[in-house]
Design a protein with these regions (language model features):
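Hydrophobic transmembrane alpha-helices and immediately adjacent juxtamembrane helices
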Residues: 1-272
Length: 272
């Protein structure tokens, strides 16, 4: 473990330094995310105002507000840029520097992202989560219940990030074949955002569509952790959702190893 830490600590530090160096860029993106969350909030407010029911598909306006906030936080913490990084490094030829290092290729990206994710969690995730926990306790929910859901949320959040990371690694490996992933990355991000429930809770989709989406990888990345912390899952549903996350994590890790072995024959160094 100590040897592993020493080997990958520079990548963690690099992730931290990159976030600190480009903090203005990070801040501007977060402002954009917050504006998007406000747009979603007022859209749902208009929907509830035009409805004669206080509940829509089992969600109250308070539930939707909490869902929007935690969807924003969860998306921020589970987002992975590994496919973008691989695509850019393949395009400019700097991928050779990573390939020559005596470290696991995918793990080098993982630990780089973990460095930045730790800072994001401390600066954004933890404050939001603390406020949500306090609000739930003040509203009358049991402390043990709230803390239990929070722990399960964090556990599910970790699994969700790892699933998303290895999914993006698998997608990023196609850069060795196609050489440029910029456009396809944007398309992939939009599709995943829709299917993951980050834009609209899957409970609002037609049953046939929601049943299909519920079992895919995208759902486990956003919808599952958010539904846990919002309190819309009972014990059996939480267990089922976590098992599904474990399943997809194993699949994605195995698939990433398989694809990596296949694409190594396509490696060519561009740039000069």
């Amino acid at each position: 473990m100590v040897k592993l830490w020493r080997r990958y600590k520079p990548f963690i530090n690099a992730g931290i330094q990159e976030l600190i160096t480009y903090r203005v860029n990070f801040l501007l993106y977060r402002i954009g995310d917050v504006m998007g969350a406000f747009v979603a909030f007022y859209l749902w407010k208009a929907v509830f105002a035009s409805s004669h029911e206080s509940l829509i598909q089992g969600f109250s306006m308070a539930d939707i507000t909490l869902y929007i906030i935690m969807s924003f936080v969860t998306n921020l913490l589970t987002r992975s840029d590994s496919s973008f990084m691989i695509g850019e490094e393949v395009k400019d030829g700097s991928i050779i520097m990573r390939l020559l290092r005596p470290v696991h290729f995918a793990a080098s990206y993982l630990f780089t992202e973990l460095g930045s994710k730790w800072l994001i969690f401390i600066s954004v995730g933890l404050p939001f989560l603390s406020v949500i926990v306090l609000m739930k306790i003040v509203s009358g929910q049991g402390i043990v219940e709230v803390l239990g859901l929070t722990v399960l949320y964090l556990f599910s959040l970790t699994l969700a990030y790892l699933i998303n990371f290895f999914f993006n690694i698998c997608f990023g490996f196609s850069a060795f074949v196609f050489k440029n992933l910029w456009g396809s990355n944007l398309l992939k991000t939009s599709i995943v955002a829709f299917m993951s429930g980050s834009l609209i809770p899957l409970a609002f989709f037609p049953k046939v569509v929601s049943d299909i989406f519920f079992n895919d990888t995208a759902t486990t990345e956003i919808y599952t952790p958010v539904m846990i912390i919002v309190g819309k899952y009972d014990t059996s549903q939480i267990l089922q959702a976590l098992l599904l996350q474990f399943f997809w994590l194993i699949v994605m890790v195995g698939l990433s190893q398989l694809i990596w072995k296949r694409v190594q024959s396509f490696i060519t160094i561009q740039g000069g």
